[in-house]
Structure formats: structure tokens, C-alpha cells
């Protein structure tokens, strides 16, 4: 199997919202984002798929080492890195942003709680903000401020993921909601770990939803006018996640403890087409 074929298979297996905007891209850009997303999926699998933390750490260290070969003109071992080697020069993808993504996965191995929102934002920057920046580079931009937009929009998407996955993460022993905010709303950790929503938990989650929604608006305002056309695929992803956030809100955000909300594939396609034609309006 060719390296690029491996990446396409990896992405197809994920059934991700990423796929909904791909059809609007050139083949070259579609392939590049496919490779990037396959890289992200592989790292996620290291953290979520290894039950032994020591094995996960060894595997993550191996990914760091193999990534070095991508940027040192050596032949990497993993097919994702082989595909990445082929595209990183074409789109000027910097090594430090891939390293930051691995650093974010390292945080998942080392800590299960975040004291403050500032701590959580660092995590979000590493696992989502830099992905947004890499996607922005692949899509193309003329104004450097577009990278600020991409980082902020990555934060919005990751906050949405965190809200959606509160129950699932709790069952894996993780709570991403900041401790300071849980204390402010008088929500002890056992409420989340035992997946038993309370009125205070509902208020905490409404606060999370409102902040995420405002983050989408702030991110959209950061996108320079001259790059709105080139960044449309990123906006499609944002629109789908924003719709997910609204569904969680309508359903009752406290219910994330008991089940996971998802946007059906046909609706994702409708959102993608609408956003392509009329833009994203959070």
C-alpha cells in the first residue's frame, strides 16, 4: 500500500467532519489535509488505544524520533510520515507545529485534570490550534493574521469536542473542565466521574457552551477579508462543529454525561454546501 493510500484509508475509517469539506479542494490540497489528519489520528490512537502508559510513552517517543527523519531528509519508517515528507515542503509546514501537536498528546499522558482555563488553552493550542494553523497553511493565505484566526478557531473546535465528550472522557478517567470553574459552580469531580448530572453541573455546562460559542465569533472576526475565500474549507469545519454545539445546547448540555450528540452525515453535507455558498455566520 502506498503511503498516501494508507492516509486516505485512515481518514475514511474515522468518519470525521473533516471529510465534509474535502470535496471543495484541489486534489493536491485534499491529499495534504488527508495526510495531516491521518497524522493526528495516529497520535490519538497512541493516547487512547494504549492501556499501558509506559507503552504509550515509548510509542509517542518513537513518533517524535520518526518525525525527525521527515525534516532531516531521511526516509521515515511510518507511511504517514513518508506521505508527510512528500507534502511538507510544498506547503511550507513547519516542524515546530508538528512537535507542538505531539507535546499536546504528551499532556494527555501526564495529566488528567486542568487547574485553570489558561492551562486548558495551552492544551487546546497544542492539539487543535496548531492543526488549524497547518490547515491554514495548506489552504493558503496572504495575510499572516490568518494564522491567528486559525489558532483561535482551533480553540473553538476543541472546546466543542471537550463539551461533547465530557461523559466519555470521564469514563476514561479524564476531566478537561477546569478545576477553578468546577469549584465556582460547586461541581465536585465525583459528579462527573459517576456521570450523575446535577443542577449545578447543568449551569457549569451552559457556561462552557456560551464561552465556546463566543470563541467561534471571536475567531471569525480575526479572519482577514482577503483570505476568506481561501479558508472556506476551514469555515466549513467550523460551521459543522458550531451546529454540533447548538445541538448540544438544545438537547441540554448536562446530558453529555449520559450520551454523545452527533451530526448525521447528510446534515453535514448540507451545512458544507450552505457554508461554501453563503459563508459561516456564528
Can you annotate each of these PLM segments?
Residues 1-159, 163, 167-282:
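Catalytic cores of Mg2+-dependent Asp-rich isoprenoid enzymes
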Amino acid at each position: 500500500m502506498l503511503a498516501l493510500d494508507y492516509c486516505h484509508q485512515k481518514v475514511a475509517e474515522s468518519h470525521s467532519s473533516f471529510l465534509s469539506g474535502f470535496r471543495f479542494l484541489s486534489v493536491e490540497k485534499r491529499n495534504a489535509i488527508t495526510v495531516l489528519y491521518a497524522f493526528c489520528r495516529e497520535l490519538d490512537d497512541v493516547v487512547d488505544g494504549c492501556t499501558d502508559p509506559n507503552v504509550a510513552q515509548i510509542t509517542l517517543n518513537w513518533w517524535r524520533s520518526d518525525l525527525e527523519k521527515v525534516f532531516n531528509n531521511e526516509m521515515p519508517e511510518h507511511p504517514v510520515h513518508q506521505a508527510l515528507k512528500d507534502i511538507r515542503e510544498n506547503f511550507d509546514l513547519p516542524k515546530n507545529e508538528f512537535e507542538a501537536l505531539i507535546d499536546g498528546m504528551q499532556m494527555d499522558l501526564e495529566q488528567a485534570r486542568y487547574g485553570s482555563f489558561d492551562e486548558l488553552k495551552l492544551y487546546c493550542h497544542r492539539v487543535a490550534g496548531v492543526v488549524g494553523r497547518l490547515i491554514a497553511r495548506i489552504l493558503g493565505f496572504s495575510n499572516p493574521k490568518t494564522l491567528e484566526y486559525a489558532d483561535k478557531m482551533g480553540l473553538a473546535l476543541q472546546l466543542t469536542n471537550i463539551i461533547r465528550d465530557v461523559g466519555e472522557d470521564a469514563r476514561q478517567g479524564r476531566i478537561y473542565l477546569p478545576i477553578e470553574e468546577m469549584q465556582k459552580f460547586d461541581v465536585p469531580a465525583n459528579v462527573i466521574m459517576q456521570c450523575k448530572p446535577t443542577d449545578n453541573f447543568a449551569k457549569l455546562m451552559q457556561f462552557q457552551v456560551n464561552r465556546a460559542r463566543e470563541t467561534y465569533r471571536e475567531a471569525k472576526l480575526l479572519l482577514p477579508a482577503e483570505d476568506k475565500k481561501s479558508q472556506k474549507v476551514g469555515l466549513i469545519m467550523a460551521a459543522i462543529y458550531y451546529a454540533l454545539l447548538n445541538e448540544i445546547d438544545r438537547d441540554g448540555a448536562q446530558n453529555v454525561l449520559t450520551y454523545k450528540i452527533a451530526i448525521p452525515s447528510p446534515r453535514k453535507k448540507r451545512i458544507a454546501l450552505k457554508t461554501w455558498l453563503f459563508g459561516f455566520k456564528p
